[in-house]
Amino acid sequence: MSKVLPKRSDDYSLWYNELVKRADLAENAPVRGCMIIKPYGYSIWEKMQAVLDKMFKETGHSNAYFPLFIPKSYLSKEASHIDGFAKECAVVTHYRLKNDENGKGIIVDPEAKLDEELIVRPTSETVIWNTYKTWIQSHRDLPLLINQWANVVRWEMRTRLFLRTTEFLWQEGHTAHATKQEAIVETEQMMNVYATFAQNFMALPVHRGIKSANERFAGAEETYCIEALMQDGKALQAGTSHFLGQNFAKAFDVKFASKEGSLEYVWGTSWGVSTRLMGALIMAHSDDEGLVLPPLLAPIQVVIVPIFKTAEQLDLIEATLKPILAALKAKDISVKFDHSDKYSPGFKFAEYELKGVPLRVAIGARDIENGTVELARRDTKEKTTVPQEGLADTIEKLLQEIQENIYKKAFAYREANTFVADDYTTFKTMLDETPGFILAHWDGTPETEEKIKEETKATIRCIPLDVTSEPGICMVTGKPSAQRVLFARAY
């Protein structure tokens, strides 16, 4: 198969789909809308998991696991919550198959109908809050800070690998608190954890903000979010954190005895990120040659490709590299020494470029004589010849520079593609001619928000917390507006 990718400028969607497949990240599964995450793609997700899990534990959270199947009656206890997910729920109605009487296959056994249908987990608030009813009795049981790593199912109609799939992997945090203020602090803290992860590890600049009522999570009183801009000018929601108030506590009768002895409902939060982050990572940084991975999340940070003609030359290269490989390992730098003779060095160069390996080292017989190696950066494609002496230190410094440069490039793109619109005509022109984030005034009503969405396909991504904005007048109605909000067309 040709490794030449479609160009982003020609067909961004095709470029993305082809890159995911050709870089061996994922492929479509037999069940429509599901995906198979391949080893290379899963290794990136594992690195994300490891970093996030450490951050969660540093903020006092513990991991647990709750069932995949949820009794249908649980979902009906929180009306606004089920309204938000009803159309996406997969339902289990029977528990057994049997052979067809004609001997031509298997069928669902009609006698094995469940007394109560089970919902395949679209999210776990209901089953977790039903459990919290037995776990929480006293103020001494609070705060309860739980996270789970799991798969969920939402029956999506329009799917795309990593970005929107019927089944996806994620983490979901669910916490319970004695006071409203503690729960709000937790909600904001987890939004900030996600933003720190996105910026420091994914090299992805994000806006922190609050969702409008129309875009709020079903069952939440407030939804905080982080929003990123992809290279085609579309926004992507990279993480959400929800202040649930006492909605789920009241629905599932979760009370605690306060220090004063009175019975009170707890306050809740939930928050999550998913394999959608993989899509964000790919679309934010990659180019027409393939993936561009930030070193902190790259499964292979450095690949060493020896250039040799004889076994003796390879032996000499391996002997030269032995202390260098040991030094890199001591620095916890992930390195692959690809000395296989199945493919030419040129093929390997192209393959590792496609897979986004941040730094490539080439070493041949002449380099051995000169005491040098050639380094090639994936982010800038710059090649340099450097001494073998102190190479591990050189590589360590260069990986830090690459991480920072990838972020700076993404930040510069976002800033160059963030616009201000003062009237609706300009707003619509910007959406069509210069896609990106648009800061504009909105009167705060769901009706105006829905009108904009219907007419332009743009949504309020968030009411930004990190953008200074003055009061003004709504670009559509002319009514007063407290501040500019962030609009974009989005994934």
Swiss-Prot record:
Keywords: Aminoacyl-tRNA synthetase, ATP-binding, Cytoplasm, Ligase, Nucleotide-binding, Protein biosynthesis. One of its GO terms (biological process) is prolyl-tRNA aminoacylation. It comes from Cytophaga hutchinsonii (strain ATCC 33406 / DSM 1761 / CIP 103989 / NBRC 15051 / NCIMB 9469 / D465). It is an enzyme of class 6 (ligase). Catalyzes the attachment of proline to tRNA(Pro) in a two-step reaction: proline is first activated by ATP to form Pro-AMP and then transferred to the acceptor end of tRNA(Pro). Homodimer. This is Proline--tRNA ligase. Transmembrane segments: none annotated. GO terms for cellular component: aminoacyl-tRNA synthetase multienzyme complex; cytoplasm. Belongs to the class-II aminoacyl-tRNA synthetase family. ProS type 3 subfamily. Its main location: cytoplasm. The gene is proS. CDD domains: ProRS_anticodon_zinc (cd00862), ProRS_core_arch_euk (cd00778).
